[in-house]
Amino acid sequence: MNIDGKPHPHSFYRDGEETRVIESVTRENEGVSIRSKIEKLLVLKSTGSAFHGFHRDEYTKLPETWDRILSTEIEAGWQWKMFKNAEEVKSVDFNGAWKAARDITMKVFAEDNSASVQATMYKMCDLILKAVPDIEAVDYALPNKHYFEIGTLQKLGSCESKSLTAS
């Protein structure tokens, strides 16, 4: 993963499945509604991610940690302001906005060392809204792809065997 033109030392993305999506609806007397998305952006950082300070109860299984591997498949979406007509739509730099949203997403993912993914998503949304004034709302999904140390699954009650086979 390149951040500010340089390879990041511990953040990576998988090239190939990332998809750029647009949804557009035009209604007479209402205008043009456009939603843009980035889907299937698979990223991983090997350090610089924490998960602590959360509510704990009898259902809590994962321990707090101040440094962990974070891997996720990012889905980011943004809703544009309502456009009055096709001429307004043509005047917008959609490519520039997509690049700004993607660059912000990658940079914050790689560099932010927050206590949770939720805090990181908030920062991403805030920066995109500031960078592209024609965007009204931003949303993210960053589901965790967990990587456990050997033995952790047994502690969580997820497996019976004490051996692991890698393939």
Where in this protein do the model-derived segments appear?
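N-terminal intrinsically disordered, cationic/polar leader segments
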Residues: 1-99, 103, 107-167
